[in-house]
């Protein structure tokens, strides 16, 4: 609170970017964690909340006759324009937000003060929801080819890797340590994904420190061990995700890429994904196009093309497609690296895994994928997404691009994913919000030192608790898209990829539909499910009624058989035709034959019994069947007194009624 100069400013206007004349008048509040704007409208006090950690840039614009404008751009692509009456108040708010949006230490972040009213046990359960050891067991590990190594115990070999790593069984500790010394940041080749159908694998590392001629025997043996771990292939693909010119330039700095003359049985492949600086500039250009107030269609499309954003998305997708095909169709293992192995490597490994394994296309499986390929393997969340005040050149939308790749796949395979667009948007939001502890720090080691699991809460538990909000209504577990590998063409054109307005323009009220397609489909699905349940209940009732009808028919057939003990003639002429013929003789008339059992008599239902046993059916029988029950009514509308013949007639009428 010591950084807040002015906690409250009144008569502030919130400008609607689509309709600038419709500015809302209200009060601006600054708290330790949020910027809050509360409208003064008498009808409703609408509130707009912005986390300080979501603020990307703050721009204090030139003072006008109406006040001093303040433009706030957020990391979740929300844009807030405020007009503060007094220039002094605007300056105080500006200085306060500059400091609050750039904390200098982790303890100032929102997650350390966020309290969702859960006890210690619930918090601990949230952190164990995603268990990577169970995920590797699901892959079929360890086995004859891969083993769990403790060589990185206490992070003694590589401080940005997790402590538990899977390596080829033939790779000894000596080979692993030697290979780590020959790799940038000591990030030696380790397993990322194992395709148990054909024993092919996806491994990841950083670039080798080869320069122009250097070599390392242990590193060469490490790649040979990866090849031997796949008995179905005699070579390994080495995929360098960088443009070839960039990789060659790194050779001058003593780094570079593998020399095929030194590494036996490898095939090299360059992909051409640009570095973090190009991606940051590309996103900025695209957002400038999104901020245009009234662009023409040609201006928007030209600006989108000029930004190059979709070309970069396609490059990442092409890399994932190549790796997925190499693993599933060729049965060949792949080693992936970029420069340091924590940006582009994470992108393409996770995209390839998503294409290969339908488990990662489920809600919990996608959480596991991010936990495995991004969090545990040391993606630099703090540097890339500006959690703390630091070098702005380190910021880049790396995981944003991966999330968009997933959305592009969802657009092409709408039935293959259990989750919907909202799920992806909420994950992207919380990567920047710092409300949960999952995406803090640059490595598992840093998170362990800060005791993140003891001091913060897990996002995965929050998403899982509200999983009903993130279900895809088109997902079918038995659909062909949900089984096996997703096959995408690597065609040289961009028409397959779309601009994601649901992400980048989701706060533009005038551009978004009032009801999303997902919400509409979910409502239709729920209504359909309700109707199916009602239909099932009606079918069960109909089946019961048909059984009763069948039993009634059997009883009547038994009643019509000649009885040796009744003393009555079975001739049609001896049976009275009207109830009056039986008057005074009712007690002597048998209601059933002596041979008929008690259980049969229990199945004879009169109309009154039917009404009492199922009131819903009796109440609606006339309306549902369209047949009025006339057997119990006199022509004048009165009720007949019960008699044997009337009961008999009701049986026959009842059968007609039930059949209807």
UniProtKB/Swiss-Prot annotation:
Q: How does it sit in the membrane?
A: Peripheral membrane protein
Q: Where is the active site?
A: 338 (phosphocysteine intermediate)
UniProt KW keywords: Coiled coil, Cytoplasm, Hydrolase, Lipid metabolism, Membrane, Phosphoprotein
Q: Locations of Basic and acidic residues compositional bias?
A: 641-653
Name the family the entry cites: Belongs to the protein-tyrosine phosphatase family. Non-receptor class myotubularin subfamily.
Example of a GO cellular component annotation carried by this entry: endomembrane system
> Which residues are noted in the entry as a 1,2-diacyl-sn-glycero-3-phospho-(1D-myo-inositol-3-phosphate)-binding?
250, 275-276, 339-344, 384
Q: Identify the gene encoding this protein.
A: MTMR7
Instruction: State where composition is biased (Polar residues).
Output: 566-596
Q: What is this protein called?
A: Phosphatidylinositol-3-phosphate phosphatase MTMR7
